[in-house]
Amino acid sequence: MTVILEAAAGLCLLYYGGIVLSTGFSVSFSLFWPFCAALFGFLAAGRHYYLNHREEIPVWPLVSAVTVLGAAAAVIAVVLVLIGTGILTSTKKSMDYVIVLGAKVNGTEPSNSLKKRLDRAIDYAENNPNTFLVLSGGQGKDEEIAEAEVMYEYLRYNGVPETQLLLETRSTNTRENIRYSQEVIRSQEQWKERVFQQIFKEVGENAYAPGDELDSIHIGILTSDFHLFRAKAIAKKQGVRNVYGISAPSDPLLIPNLWLRECFAILKDKFMGNI
C-alpha cells in the first residue's frame, strides 16, 4: 500500500508537470495535482510510521482517515458517472435555439477550449440553418472584451450568417449563462410575435403568433463535453423543459483536470441550490 501511495504521488506530480509544459501555469485547478501529491506522500509516510510504531498508535485515527477518504472517493466516482452520462446525450436536429456557452478568451481571440465549442457550433449551424445561436458570455476580470463578442467575430469569419446569431454579454457563470440567454430568447420570440401580428393585420386575417412562453420551444446547450451535465441540470432547475445537449471535445491532456474540477463545481452548485 505504501508503494501505491508513493506511486500515486509521483503520477500526480508528473501530470502537473505535463500540464505546465503543455499549457503553462494558467490552467485553473491545476494546483490540485501537487496538493494531491503532497496528500499521497503524507499518507505514505503516515502508513510507514504506523507500521513501525503500531503498538504506540491507536487504531481510530487510521480508521477515521480511511473512512473519510473512502467516502470522498465514492462521492467523486458517482459525480464522474453523472458527467459521463451528459456526454452520452444524443444531439437533436433543427432546434429553435442553441445556447453556446462562452469560455476564457485571450485578448480578442478564443482560447482552445472556446474554439472547440465554436467549431462545433459552426458545424451545427451549417446543418441547421433555421436554428438561432445564442452566444452567451460576459467580460471576465482579465478579459478585454465580452466572450460573446469574440464568439460572434469568430463565427462570422467562418461563414455563419449574422441573422443566425444572438448575443448575451452579461453572464459571468453557467447559471447566468442560462438565465440571461433565456431572456434573449424570450425577447426574440416577442419580436417574432410582433412581426406575425403586423403581417396578419396587413393581410386582414386573424393574428397568430408563437407567444413568449418557452415551454414549446426546443433549446440546445452547446458546451464542452465535461460541462454538459451541469449546464443541462442548471437549465432544468431554471424551468427550461425542452433542453438538449450538444457536446464539444476537450483537450485530451486536460481531461483528468477538467473532470475533477467539474466534480467540485457540480457539488458546489448542488449545495447552492442551482441544480
In which residue ranges do the predicted regions lie?
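Structural signature of transmembrane alpha-helix termini at the membrane-water interface
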Residues: 15-25, 49, 77-85, 267-274
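Structural motif marking the loop-to-transmembrane transition
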Residues: 1-4, 57, 61, 252, ...
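Hydrophobic alpha-helical transmembrane segments of multipass integral membrane proteins
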Residues: 7-17, 42, 67-80, 263
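Transmembrane alpha-helices and immediately adjacent membrane-cytoplasm interface residues
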Residues: 44-89
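Membrane-embedded alpha-helical segments of integral membrane proteins
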Residues: 1-50
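Generic hydrophobic, helix-prone segments enriched in Leu/Val/Ile
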Residues: 17-18, 65, 229, 255
